[in-house]
Amino acid sequence: MDQKLSELVEELTTSGEPQLNPEKMKQLKKICKSSEEQLGHAYHLLMAQLSQEHAEIRLSAFQVLDQLFARSHQFRTLVVSNFQEFLELTLGTDHERPLPPPREVAQRLRQAATQAIRGWNEKYGAAYKKLALGFHFLKHSKQVDFQDVDARTVAERKRAEERQKRLDRIYKERSEWAAREMEEMSTEIRGCLTELESCFRLLLPFDLDLAPGAAWCPVPEKGDRDEEQPCCSKSLAACAHHPGAMDAGGPPSEDEDRDPDGFVRRHGLGSRQYTLDVELSSDSLRVRENEDNSAVIRAARDALRLIQNKLLPAACSWVQLFTRAGTYGGHLEGAIHLKAELEAALKRSRELDIVPEEGRSGETAAPGDEDEDEDDFVEVPEKEGYEACVPEHLRPECGEQRHGPGRGLEEGLAAPGSQARKRPGSDMEAFDPTSAAAQQQWPRPHGPPASPPSPRAPLAPEQAAWRAAEQARAPVVPFGVDLCYWGQEELMAGKILKCDSEHRFWKPCEVDAEVESASVSEALRSRRITFAGQFEPVQHRCRAPRPDGQLCARQDRLKCPFHGKIIPRDDAGRPLNAEDRAREQRQQLQRPAGRPDWQDPEFLRDVEAATGVDLGSSRPGGKGKGKRRKHSGLTDLKRQADTARARIAKKVFAKAAVQRVVTAMNQMDEKKHEKFANQFNYALN
């Protein structure tokens, strides 16, 4: 019976479920009813489970204890007799012994214990004095608020209050700053909205909301119609001048007011008893940009860009700050009103197809901008027949003196007097990049022109064939230090400055001392070439017997990854050497039954060393045979939290990843050593 009771308590408390199993709980109650001894044993088992450092075990144990507390007077007496320890294990009243993880389950345990103790006090407090004293101690000494749903302790409530006060102070400061900013920017917002509304009225001179059919164009009076009207627009007029234009779209006159029937007939209306709503499509409201309205559209786009990038985000942030603060009612209403007006302006701009986008195609440049661009850069056609450099045969005609590379001082003195005379200002012309003298100097090198290479004499056919054969047979090696110092008898050795004194400020003069190194000199004269040998294909096979009765056909050079070292075997797969046969017999005797060949510990260790993956060779049970968890339903406290940092660390610090990094760093060191091996300071270290 005791064994059955222990198993039931362990299964109930280590299941990890939020609710207890009703069937097992019924069996536990039945055993506890049998005798007081079993009830006391159950109490000690539950208190032992409450002492476990796992919040899920404590929560399940408390749920079992709560049900038994409500059914047995003897059990209530046992719990109340050790009530202080019970409070420490369920409520965490001792700050030196806090509730164990997981944190969420510990919070649920505290809430459940608080509600249960309050119910116990209301129901059994009069009969159990120690229970009433414990409730009074929690309420007045430990400051436990039994009305608090979260069942927080005094320290937790103080921390929450301090956090809330700090947030309120931050929100208040931000709200005051937002109120000052809104007062400063209100004028700018109103001005921007007024400017944008004026642009909309200039582009669309009627209001669609008030009178959908009131779009009329002002037409000149009849007396002025015959006169010529000045017009500077290159676009078509908005309203065509035709004989019926005055009657169809002109402003209402006094005759129409006196004759309402004529007004109805002229407009095609049957009567005045109904109204007509004209719906305009969005395509008909799009503003087309031309030369007349380009400046207005550009101003509207600038205002819309300002609203979209600065004013509307500021208004949204004001609304958010005032909403969080909750104490700036008037400012909140003003911010909401400004936000609504800005959003309405953006909506109307989208209806008119005026979008504040950068580099919009189709923008017509203003005339002033075109003039400025033309003033800055003027395209000049290139002069016909222009040559940047004067040819050699035309330089005497241009008055320039031609000096050959072999002419000396005598020839220069023997020149005619007209050419020997030096013109005034010729030195200044040489520095002027636009002068002919400077153009003569800059394309030519400072030294004498190099003579063209002399053509090589053609070789005889026999010599050419021999030379081609020798070139084909000669090895091609990359250029190195040995080729750089090829044929030099004396090499420049490295110099090291030696200073014998180590005083801080009194020093002797530095003396250059030449240190010769035999290894450096040898490296400068010779080259090390690695000879890998000639590839020889593998002719033999593994020929080890496989479980299916066939022989292994792998052609590895030294060692088979499945059967180990390759040894000579006969056609049946038996080793030819007696030592190999004896060794295989010993391995078969030592191999446990039921384990395949690929789980051999020696083979697994070789594979682990090659791949860097743990295959379980160090464990006694092989791969996947590690120690299993005793209670799989509980949360594993030793498991690392599944966070982004943990996942990245698992990938970065994996054994295979570390091995790859080590290999790459070793290769970098080898390349660096090969690159700087011929330098004396690296060679001497």
UniProtKB/Swiss-Prot annotation:
Which residues does UniProt call coiled coil?
153-198
The listed locations are: Chromosome
Return one GO MF term. RNA polymerase II complex binding
Q: How is it modified after translation?
A: Monoubiquitinated at Lys-383 in response to transcription stress; this promotes efficient transfer of TFIIH to stalled RNA polymerase II.
Superkingdom per UniProt: Eukaryota
Task: Name one matching Pfam family.
Answer: DUF2043
Composition bias, Basic and acidic residues: 380-403, 567-586
Q: Where in the chain are the UVSSA-type zinc fingers?
A: 539-566
Sites of the modification Phosphoserine? 253
Membrane-spanning residues: none
Pro residues composition-biased segments: 445-458
Region annotation VHS-like: where it falls in the sequence = 2-145
Biological role stated in the UniProt entry: Factor involved in transcription-coupled nucleotide excision repair (TC-NER), a mechanism that rapidly removes RNA polymerase II-blocking lesions from the transcribed strand of active genes. Acts as a key adapter that promotes recruitment of factors involved in TC-NER. Facilitates the ubiquitination of the elongating form of RNA polymerase II (RNA pol IIo) at DNA damage sites, thereby promoting RNA pol IIo backtracking and access by the TC-NER machinery to lesion sites.
Oligomeric state and interaction partners are given as: Interacts with the elongating form of RNA polymerase II (RNA pol IIo) during transcription stress. Interacts with the TFIIH complex during transcription stress. Interacts with ERCC6. Interacts with ERCC8. Interacts with USP7.
Name it.
UV-stimulated scaffold protein A
Source organism per entry reads Bos taurus
Gene encoding the protein:
UVSSA
